[in-house]
Amino acid sequence: MKKKVLAIALVTVFTGTGVAQAADVTAQAVATWSATAKKDTTSKLVVTPLGSLAFQYAEGIKGFNSQKGLFDVAIEGDSTATAFKLTSRLITNTLTQLDTSGSTLNVGVDYNGTAVEKTGDTVMIDTANGVLGGNLSPLANGYNASNRTTAQDGFTFSIISGTTNGTTAVTDYSTLPEGIWSGDVSVQFDATWTS
């Protein structure tokens, strides 16, 4: 009898040991891609963003990452043209927090070291003045061809300023409220064929 009691006590000790273990901890995050589809091969000028932007706050630098945003430019040639100019201008760049705080972030846009501003045009190509567009140079070479010409380049996007409530500016992004900001960054492109 003593042996049975001792055996039952030992079994109870071994089976009860696992109960004191810590519970598993799991975390989950969701990645979201914006999705639309569009085809335009007849307009004189078509600019297509080649991706979307997603800024992440990095605690170690107390700031947001910057991103290269690629785009594709297609133009229809004009055989009577003697010069071609392509410019860009920032239209919208404010992201607003998706809660009641009213917090905003402003996105800066940079093209080859030059800020793209709302107040003026940034020259990307100007064949009359010898600005041939770097990665966009196929457009500078094909603007007077009888077919369509395409080229790809990119802007650098970064968070350049923010507010905690829509009016109070922050200099330290770590003081921003937690959450998600959303909005559009729009750049207008203007092409001019001179005959």
Curated annotation (Swiss-Prot):
This is Common pilus major fimbrillin subunit EcpA. Changing residue 68 to E: Decreases ability to form biofilms. The keyword Signal applies. It comes from Escherichia coli O6:H1 (strain CFT073 / ATCC 700928 / UPEC). Self-associates. Forms filaments. Interacts with EcpD. Changing residue 98 to D: Decreases ability to form biofilms. One of its GO terms (cellular component) is pilus. It holds the Pfam family MatB. Part of the ecpRABCDE operon, which encodes the E.coli common pilus (ECP). ECP is found in both commensal and pathogenic strains and plays a dual role in early-stage biofilm development and host cell recognition. Major subunit of the fimbria. InterPro entries: EcpA (IPR016514), Fimbrillin_EcpA_sf (IPR038478). Residues 1-22 form the signal peptide. Keywords: Fimbrium, Signal. Induction: Negatively regulated by H-NS. Positively regulated by IHF and EcpR. Belongs to the EcpA/MatB fimbrillin family. It is found in: Fimbrium.
